[in-house]
């Protein structure tokens, strides 16, 4: 590759502004999903407005948890309930792993804190659990896909039709590999992710859809595991991002961990027992600390009580708001650094910000609100939108824009979060697209060879703000070969960077002399799933869906058989029913039959739905004729078992 003297800028820099127009190739419905670290949320734009949808328990946010217990997979609230009982079998916080390398320092830290096993699979962090006593490994994309699938099911239940398309949000500071991994998770879940939208941009859509006059807003998005800040200007339907910054590993989970560490030390000092030695104990503490943190947003003191947390010891401690704030003071103040950075990048004074919009559950913390208010010289943050639902709300609006649902005049101009470039001689980071460039965008630059008769050039693509590539993040690399022999500096190699509307980068290199070119969509070549892996995971996801369906049918069939047995037993033994009217021989026949059925149930716990249905038929074939015979006798007013709630038009 040529040095700085050897390359010249060619062609153009084109900022192709992303106008969020209708896409006629996509057929609805399209749902909007906030795929969160700790909770997820789904919405849909319908009949001119956004509906945030309830899950099967009536809640509008669903825990991003997946559990594998006794051969059964659970997602959401049911999975979170398993966390204290089966900590190694319950997976959460997977958003902190997706798109990362196993040797990332953040992954190394998470491995010490998360109760489930994280293993190295070709340089990528994978999750290992036991399913039917066999170790089974999942990529983070697969776990995220299970959460996305849950969101899809919630939407399908509401809409009454299949859903294949979605807009999914990601932290603005997610890098290229993390964005691609999120798209892969969508594919595994059977969803075509038609657009990836940055979380603070989605929140701005939720806040400013009806704003007609020019308004500058700062979105402060502090969730369970990630943190973003963006400055946008909204002007009559145009949403332009001026700057974005953040930390993809800072959020409510970190605040919880500080409190847990404090109590773990206190408990060890009092009882000489380390709670970290018992994963169940840690999960019990994690659950109660999260509840305590939420309580402290409305009260100044709360009690944490955990019966038999470990070895017969009870846990009983008070947590005050003041202590919680003291334990997390440095983390709270750390959130101001990205705020300062976006103001500097956007060349904005604090006084130019018209509105401060708080998003994410962690912004309910009073100290966070106070720190922001103090930083902006007493300006009150806007609390007009639900911090838990705003991002999904904005994603649903974006879905409506794509479908042309009365929102054709809305325009989004988002930006790249990090500078993109290639390595040139000496390990220099040569920048092609600077951070906070409006996307989609395209930039070309011409380079040359470093040595005489050099037959190939290696294109190494990085993202980051440092001068040397060793201090930045390698996204991927490829080689352009077949360059004709020539003196150094003579061949002209044009490198073109294209960032699409989802913030995903494509790089192409062309030898201008021969016209030969090569390109790749940069996705962290060591971090992304291959096409074959994705297809296998899609098949695995379908298999899991079939297993879930079979399990539901099995449970339903077992319940039907068990209910029939109990109902029949009550019918022949209850004096208010048929106990005094049934002949002893018939009664013995029924009791023997249902006793045999009970024994069969106990001895065939693994029986499938068909076997259970067949057993019910066999029991009914013996019992029902006897009951029908009795039912026809004078004074026998009790209907046959199983018929109590049946409506009939016949007399």
Curated annotation (Swiss-Prot):
Gene Ontology CC annotations of this record: endoplasmic reticulum membrane
Entry EC no(s): 3.6.4.10
Activity-regulation annotation: The chaperone activity is regulated by ATP-induced allosteric coupling of the nucleotide-binding (NBD) and substrate-binding (SBD) domains. In the ADP-bound and nucleotide-free (apo) states, the two domains have little interaction. In contrast, in the ATP-bound state the two domains are tightly coupled, which results in drastically accelerated kinetics in both binding and release of polypeptide substrates. J domain-containing co-chaperones stimulate the ATPase activity and are required for efficient substrate recognition.
Intracellular or extracellular location(s): Endoplasmic reticulum
Keyword set includes Nucleotide-binding: yes
Annotated spans, Disordered: 631-651
Residues spanning the signal sequence: 1-21
Keywords (A to Z) from UniProt: ATP-binding, Chaperone, Coiled coil, Endoplasmic reticulum, Hydrolase, Nucleotide-binding, Signal
Coiled coil regions, renumbered to chain: 534-622
Region named Substrate-binding (SBD): 397-496
GO molecular function, one term: ATP-dependent protein folding chaperone
Motif (Prevents secretion from ER): 648-651
Main location: endoplasmic reticulum
Annotated spans, Nucleotide-binding (NBD): 124-277
Bias-annotated ranges (Acidic residues): 642-651
Pfam families documented for this protein: HSP70
Positions of ATP binding: 36-39, 95, 224-226, 290-297, 361-364
Catalytic activity from the UniProt record: ATP + H2O = ADP + phosphate + H(+)
Matches recorded under InterPro entries: ATPase_NBD, BIP_NBD, Heat_shock_70_CS, HSP70_C_sf, HSP70_peptide-bd_sf, Hsp_70_fam
Family label: Belongs to the heat shock protein 70 family.
Binding partners and assembly: Interacts with PK4; the interaction is disrupted in response to stress.
Task of the protein: Endoplasmic reticulum chaperone that plays a key role in protein folding and quality control in the endoplasmic reticulum lumen. Involved in the correct folding of proteins and degradation of misfolded proteins. Acts as a key repressor of the unfolded protein response (UPR).
Protein name per the record: Endoplasmic reticulum chaperone BIP
Source species of the chain: Plasmodium berghei (strain Anka)
């Amino acid at each position: 590759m040529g040095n700085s003297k050897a390359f010249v800028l060619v062609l153009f820099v084109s900022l192709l502004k992303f106008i969020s127009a209708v896409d006629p190739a996509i057929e609805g419905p399209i749902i909007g999903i906030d795929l969160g670290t700790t909770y997820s949320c789904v919405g849909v734009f319908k009949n001119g407005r956004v509906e945030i949808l309830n899950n099967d328990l009536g809640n509008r946010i669903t825990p991003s948890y997946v559990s594998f217990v006794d051969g059964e997979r659970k997602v959401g609230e049911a999975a979170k309930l398993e966390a204290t009982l089966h900590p190694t079998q319950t997976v959460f916080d997977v958003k902190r792993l997706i798109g990362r390398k196993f040797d990332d320092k953040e992954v190394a830290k998470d491995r010490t804190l998360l109760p489930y096993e994280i293993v190295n699979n070709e340089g990528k962090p994978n999750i290992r659990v036991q399913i039917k006593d066999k170790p089974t490994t999942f990529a983070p994309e697969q776990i995220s896909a299970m959460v996305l699938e849950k969101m899809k099911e919630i939407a399908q239940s509401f809409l009454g039709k299949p859903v294949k398309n979605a807009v999914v949000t990601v932290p603005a500071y997610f890098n290229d590999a993390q964005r691609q991994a999120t798209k892969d998770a969508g594919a595994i879940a059977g969803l075509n992710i038609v657009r990836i939208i940055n979380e603070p941009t989605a929140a701005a859509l939720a806040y400013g859809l009806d704003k007609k006059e020019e308004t500058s807003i700062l979105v402060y998005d502090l969730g369970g595991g990630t943190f973003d800040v963006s400055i946008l200007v909204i002007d009559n339907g145009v949403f332009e991002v001026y700057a974005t910054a953040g930390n993809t590993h800072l959020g409510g989970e970190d605040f919880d961990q500080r409190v847990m560490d404090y109590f773990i030390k206190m408990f060890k000092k009092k009882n000489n027992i380390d709670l970290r030695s018992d994963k169940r104990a840690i999960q019990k503490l994690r659950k109660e600390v999260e509840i305590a943190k939420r309580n402290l947003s409305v009260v100044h003191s709360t009690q944490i009580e955990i019966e038999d947390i470990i070895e017969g010891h009870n846990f009983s401690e008070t947590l005050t708001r003041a202590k919680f704030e003291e334990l997390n003071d440095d983390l709270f103040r750390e959130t101001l650094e990205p705020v300062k950075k976006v103001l500097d990048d956007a060349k904005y004074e604090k006084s130019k910000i018209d509105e401060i919009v708080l998003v994410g559950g962690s912004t309910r913390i009073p100290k966070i609100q106070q720190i922001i208010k103090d930083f902006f010289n007493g300006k009150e943050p806007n609390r007009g939108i639900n911090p838990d639902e705003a991002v999904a709300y904005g994603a649903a609006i974006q879905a409506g824009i794509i479908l042309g649902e009365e929102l054709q005049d809305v325009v989004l101009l988002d930006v790249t979060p990090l500078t993109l470039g290639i390595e040139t001689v000496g390990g220099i980071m040569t920048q092609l697209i600077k951070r906070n460039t409006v996307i989609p965008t395209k930039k070309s630059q011409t380079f040359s060879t470093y040595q005489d008769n050099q037959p190939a050039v290696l294109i190494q693509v990085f993202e980051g703000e440092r001068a040397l590539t060793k201090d930045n993040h390698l996204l991927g690399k490829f080689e352009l070969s077949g360059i004709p022999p020539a003196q150094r500096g003579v061949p002209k190699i044009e490198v073109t960077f294209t960032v699409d509307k989802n913030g995903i980068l494509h790089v192409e290199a062309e030898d201008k002399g021969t016209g030969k070119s090569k390109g790749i969509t940069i996705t962290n070549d060591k971090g992304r799933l291959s096409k074959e892996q994705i297809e296998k995971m899609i098949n695995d996801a379908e298999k899991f869906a079939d297993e879930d369906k079979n399990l539901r049918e099995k449970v339903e069939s077992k319940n039907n058989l068990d209910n029939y047995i109990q109902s029949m037993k009550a019918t022949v033994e209850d004096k208010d029913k048929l106990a005094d009217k049934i002949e002893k021989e018939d009664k013995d026949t029924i009791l023997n039959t249902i006793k045999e059925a009970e024994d069969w149930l106990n001895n065939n716990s693994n029986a499938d739905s068909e076997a259970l249905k067949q057993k019910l038929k066999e029991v009914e074939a013996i019992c029902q004729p006897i009951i029908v015979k009795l039912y026809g006798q004078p004074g026998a007013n009790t209907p046959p078992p199983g018929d109590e709630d049946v409506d009939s038009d016949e007399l």
